[in-house]
């Protein structure tokens, strides 16, 4: 109850639930150590990346990418910590994020402001990866093998008769409006990928490999997005082991 009161007070005084300063420091140190330079850039990644964010200032979606295509000559130079903080800026939980950087080749300084979590439109980013592979990298659809890891979904079984503003914004310690937006997008993308894979009715011959691992929480075992208690972390670990057990045969 104390934690819930603290969050409510922060919102009343126009503050997000959390301050990102310590998180940013830890992430920055980790990235710089791995890259061997400071600041570590997105291009220091050892694998291809497509990281979605939403630019509230311009009302536009961005996907920050590594330089895995000859035309991708800009975003790979972004400081990795700024990309991470941008896509982690979930509304209410963290303030929107802004940053600027200078390209390595000495080009014009780039500035971004009011960037928020890409999860509001790509909580399930599978379609981004699919499109990048097929359209940008020209990988044949039949060669695709996609593993999509969900963040969990919750059936709203405790619905009141009328869904009021209080229910959506802060009922039982949960910010349900954000849950709804991210879950709806994730479910839509998953259904769309199944359609691409097997066609109408999910009954056709698979065009490519697609596995979606998603856990359905009940009201008594749900873990909040900002719940980092040891009990909840252990519960999430157990869920991961159960999902692997259920899908191990198809994944291997």
Regions found by a protein language model. Give the residues of each.
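Conserved catalytic cores and adjacent C-terminal regulatory segments
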Residues: 1-252
């Amino acid at each position: 109850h104390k934690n819930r009161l603290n969050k409510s007070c922060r919102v009343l005084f126009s503050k997000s639930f959390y301050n990102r300063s310590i998180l940013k420091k830890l992430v920055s140190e980790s990235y710089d150590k791995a890259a061997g330079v400071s600041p570590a850039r997105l291009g220091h990644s050892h694998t291809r990346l497509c990281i979605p964010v939403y630019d509230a200032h311009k009302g536009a979606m961005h996907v920050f990418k590594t330089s895995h295509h000859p035309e991708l000559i800009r975003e790979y130079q972004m400081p990795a910590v700024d990309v991470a903080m941008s896509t982690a800026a979930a509304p209410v939980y963290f303030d929107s994020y802004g940053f600027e950087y200078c390209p390595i080749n000495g080009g014009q300084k780039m500035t971004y402001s009011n960037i928020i979590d890409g999860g509001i439109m790509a909580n399930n980013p599978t379609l981004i990866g699919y499109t990048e592979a097929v359209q940008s990298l020209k990988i044949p659809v039949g060669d695709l093998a996609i593993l999509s890891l969900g963040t969990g979904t919750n059936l709203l079984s405790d619905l009141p008769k009328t869904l009021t503003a209080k229910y959506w914004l802060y009922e039982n310690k949960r910010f349900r409006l954000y849950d709804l937006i991210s879950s709806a997008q994730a479910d839509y993308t998953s259904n769309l990928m199944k359609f691409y894979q097997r066609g109408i009715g999910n009954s056709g011959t698979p065009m490519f490999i697609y596995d979606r691992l998603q856990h359905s929480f009940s009201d008594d075992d749900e873990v909040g997005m900002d719940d980092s208690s040891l009990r909840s972390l252990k519960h999430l670990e157990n869920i991961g082991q159960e999902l692997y057990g259920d899908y191990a045969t198809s994944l291997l």
